[in-house]
Regions:
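Polyanion-engaging groove/track-forming segments
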Residues: 1-171
């Protein structure tokens, strides 16, 4: 599901709903508090589209609030987190825009998965499940990366140079 939410966010031009669906997914690497702060700022300042890619400069508490050192620090941390999260999504979006074939789209998605450390996140989640006695769920997560890579390889090999509209890739 995380892969689909990332594709929705990137190919949907970063509308708030799809971005937060991705950020709230278990594999995005964003903790709940950070996600809440990003979401509050985005709603407060109506962040959508390319505004996700621009530096955030508005007060984290809204208009009329004093710029204290604490507020500046919070904004700086929010903006750093925004950059960390949005750079891979922007590269994914650009990879799909530049793609002339399904192969190029598969490569863009694979590069995104590598950038965000998806394989390592799946392994860490599987280890946590294993440690809590959820062996079956752990095994499923351990297999997920291989299944995803196999599916992408098959798409690459079979459909290769086929022209494919980005929005069809998600379906």
């Amino acid at each position: 599901a995380t892969v689909l939410t990332a594709l929705d966010a990137a190919l949907g031009d970063f509308d708030q709903r799809s971005v937060f669906r991705y950020l709230r997914s278990a594999l995005s690497g964003v903790d709940y508090d950070t996600c809440d702060r990003l979401e509050n700022y985005a709603f407060l300042w109506d962040i959508r589209g390319n505004r996700w890619l621009s530096d955030w400069k508005n007060h984290p508490d809204g208009l009329g609030n004093d710029w204290t050192e604490e507020a500046k620090s919070r904004l700086e941390l929010l903006d750093q987190e925004r950059r960390r999260l949005m750079e891979p999504l922007e590269q994914l979006r650009q990879g799909f825009r530049d793609a002339s074939s399904l192969n190029s789209q598969v490569e863009a998605l694979y590069q995104f998965l590598e950038r965000v450390g998806m394989e390592q996140r799946l392994e860490a989640m599987a280890q946590e499940l294993d440690e809590t006695g959820s062996n079956r769920e752990s095994q499923i997560l351990n297999q997920l990366w291989e299944i995803l890579m196999s599916a992408l390889e098959q798409m690459y090999d079979v459909l290769g140079q086929t022209h494919w509209e980005p929005e069809h890739f998600v379906r």
